[in-house]
Every structure is written in C-alpha cells, then in structure tokens.
Amino acid sequence: MHYLNISFTYKNTDISVREKLAFDSDEKKDQILRLLKSSKNIIECMVLSTCNRVEVLAYTNDIKSAMTHIIRCLTVYSGVFEDELFERADIYEDSGAVHHLFAVASSLDSLVVGETQIVGQLKNAFKFAFDNASSGEHISRLVHYACKCAARVRNETQISKNPISVSSVAVAKAKEIFGTLENKTAVVIGAGEMGELAAKHLITSGANVIIINRSSDHVEELVENLGDKASWDSILKLKEYINKYDLIFSSTSAPHAIITGELIEPQEFRRYFFDIAVPRDIDLVNTDKISVYSVDSLEEMVRRNLALREEQAQTAYSIVGQSTNEFLKFLKDNISIPLIKTIRKKAEICAEAELEKALKKGYLKHSDKEEAAKLIHQVFKAFLHSPTINLKSLASKNDAEQIAGGIKFLFDIKEENLENLTKDIDEI
C-alpha cells in the first residue's frame, strides 16, 4: 500500500487554472470524492482546496494506476487537459507524500510561511472526506501525525510569530499605499473565512469596515463581534459601494466574477481592489484610476516576509524531517507488531485444538490438561522466540512490506484476519 499526493499550488499553477480546479463548495467536494473513489485502486482519499493550493491525497494499492485515475478525474471536473495537469502537478509518493503533507500542515509550503489557517483547513478537509466515507484509518493516521508535526513547529519555532495570511498581506499592501488606514473606510465583500480575516486586520489597523454579503447569515454575528468599527449591508448595493469607496476587498465563493467593467462608474478618485478569492471575484483591467491586486500579485510582498522567516523555516524543516521518520517507523512497527500477535494467536489456537483432540481420544488424562497446556505454551513460546525477535527488527528494514507479505503467505494470514485480531495492539 502507498500514500500518493498530487499537488497544484501557486508554485506550479497560475490562478486561472487553480480556480478551475478549486473545490469551493461541499457539492463540488462530494462530486470529486465520488469520482476518485470509483477506482478500485483508490482505497482512501481526501481533497484539500484553499486559495493557494488544490491537493489530492490518496492511499492506494497501485501508485501508477491511482495517479492516472486522479488526473483523469480532475480533467473531467475542471476541463483542463490531462497533459497540462500532468505537466503542472507536483507528485509525491510514499515518504515524499508524508514529508510534503507535514510541510504543508506546518505552513512551510504556504505562500505566506507561518500562517496558521492551513491546519484548520487540513482538519476540515479530512473531516469532510471521513464523513463522506472517502477516508479511513490510513489517512486519519497521516493527518493526525501531520497536525502533531505542525504543533511542534508552532511551539518550538517562532515561525508563526506575528502570523500573516493572504488577507493580512493584502491589508499590509493597502497600508503601504495609503500610509495609514486610521479612520479610513474599507469595503469587504463576503463574510467567509478570508473576508472575516481581512475585516479583522483592517479594524486592527484602525479602519472602519463595511461588509457586503448575500444574506444576514453569520454576518450579523460577525459584525457584532468586530465591534463599533464594523457594519454590513446587502450585496444588492454592491454597485453603489464599489463606486463610492476607494478601498475594496473581495472574497466570496461565487463561481464567477462579481465585479466587472459594467458595474464601474467613472470617478475622480483612484480605487484599489484586492481580489483575495479563488475563483477570482474581480474582472477588471488596471487603469490610471483603478488598481487590482489578485492573490498572485501579492506574491512579491509575501516573499519579503518569507526572507525574514528563513532561519526559523530551517529549524521547522528539521522538525518535519524528524516527524516524517517517526511516522514511517510507526508504519513499519504497525507491520511487525500485528504480525507477531497474529502468528502467536494462530499457534495458540492450533495448540488448543490439538490438546482437545488428545483429550477426546484418551491420549491424555483430563487431570493432566492444565500441566499439558502449560507445556505446550512453553514449547510454542520457545519456538516463536527467534521469529518474534526478527519480526520486531522489520521496522529498521527498507523492504519491510515485502518481507511481511512473504510471512503472511507462509502462515496463510489474510489482511482481514490481521485487522480483526489486532484492533487493540498492546506493546509486546
């Protein structure tokens, strides 16, 4: 069995393709998970979709077949040709897939290194897949260890000190443009996660915020929590607000652009639009009166922040490497320990059966049963001593899975029996 990760990020895929791949609703996530699980080679899977990445994580019995199937599913979903997806994708297998996910969870692969949103996004992605019966114990273990690794990085480095996200970078860019945001009014379109973060950063910077949203759901509570500097209005007044104010942030989950040239009225003042949505919310051309910043155009500012965190990132990568090795050792241990327990159980069952036969045929007195059982137990314990020691050493061998497969064949151990006998494995 293998772990496989196929990754499309800001590093290898521009926003025009990423927005086609984005799974920005539960319906779309459910659709792609159903497609992925239609292959017998995909045992478990989950999808992680954020403004900067789309990743498919799979647990598979055949990496090549799974890889081809995943790319075909993404083509069916997005309309992007298979060849282009293969060319753009970063593909990680086995230990590489583990290391990559741990780096992602630790925010080392993020556009903004050190941002803390990604752990929550990873947990939510797993929960959705698990609730929809697409993920099980194998991806669960991997995500659990990934979150443990992220916690270590957070606690043992200062990489998340003064954490920043795409939203905060956009606000910082606005502050750079205007000099100060104190008492300035900014319009935030959308009350989702990114919009909420943008509003919080704006208010922290001294700005007043008007949140434009399609419905009152969530936004009323959000405005109340944000305090006196926040208010909200209906999306029906979108045209009015984007022509009245000069600082606009947009982060909705709309499948198409909501701000286009048809809505723009000529104004004497210069307007600054920050599009932090994927797919993009804004379809405008930069002019002498309009400047548009997308997720990708914020990259230069983000990279300056990355340079400041480089030293901490090196320490964090060391932790990711250690955590990867720990997880791989856990996987190998999880091969040997169930095998040991199952072989011992089979020996015990066989010994008990032969003892009962001896009693029935009169070869052994019932009064001697207890002593005979002890003797048999000592015999198979002595016989299995060396195999047990050697099996425990499997964890240090690169070909552990192949050796384990041979042992299962010799002892006629089926995978389902192995799982049933070893659901609660104690240390041996």
From Swiss-Prot:
Substrate binds at T50, C51, N52, R53, S110, E115, T116, Q117, Q121. It catalyses: (S)-4-amino-5-oxopentanoate + tRNA(Glu) + NADP(+) = L-glutamyl-tRNA(Glu) + NADPH + H(+). GO terms for molecular function: glutamyl-tRNA reductase activity; NADP binding. NADP(+) binds at G190, A191, G192, E193, M194, G195. PANTHER family: GLUTAMYL-TRNA REDUCTASE (PTHR43013:SF1). NCBIfam families: hemA. Belongs to the glutamyl-tRNA reductase family. Its EC number is 1.2.1.70. The record marks H100 as: Important for activity. Keywords: NADP, Oxidoreductase, Porphyrin biosynthesis. InterPro entries: 4pyrrol_synth_GluRdtase, 4pyrrol_synth_GluRdtase_dimer, 4pyrrol_synth_GluRdtase_N, GluRdtase_CS, GluRdtase_dimer_dom_sf, GluRdtase_N_sf, NAD(P)-bd_dom_sf, Prot_inh_cystat_CS. During catalysis, the active site Cys acts as a nucleophile attacking the alpha-carbonyl group of tRNA-bound glutamate with the formation of a thioester intermediate between enzyme and glutamate, and the concomitant release of tRNA(Glu). The thioester intermediate is finally reduced by direct hydride transfer from NADPH, to form the product GSA. Pathway: Porphyrin-containing compound metabolism; protoporphyrin-IX biosynthesis; 5-aminolevulinate from L-glutamyl-tRNA(Glu): step 1/2. The active site is at C51 (nucleophile). It is an enzyme of class 1 (oxidoreductase). GO terms for biological process: protoporphyrinogen IX biosynthetic process from glutamate. Pfam families: GlutR_dimer, GlutR_N, Shikimate_DH. Homodimer. Catalyzes the NADPH-dependent reduction of glutamyl-tRNA(Glu) to glutamate 1-semialdehyde (GSA). Gene3D superfamilies: Glutamyl-tRNA reductase, N-terminal domain, NAD(P)-binding Rossmann-like Domain. This is Glutamyl-tRNA reductase. It comes from Campylobacter curvus (strain 525.92). Possesses an unusual extended V-shaped dimeric structure with each monomer consisting of three distinct domains arranged along a curved 'spinal' alpha-helix. The N-terminal catalytic domain specifically recognizes the glutamate moiety of the substrate. The second domain is the NADPH-binding domain, and the third C-terminal domain is responsible for dimerization.
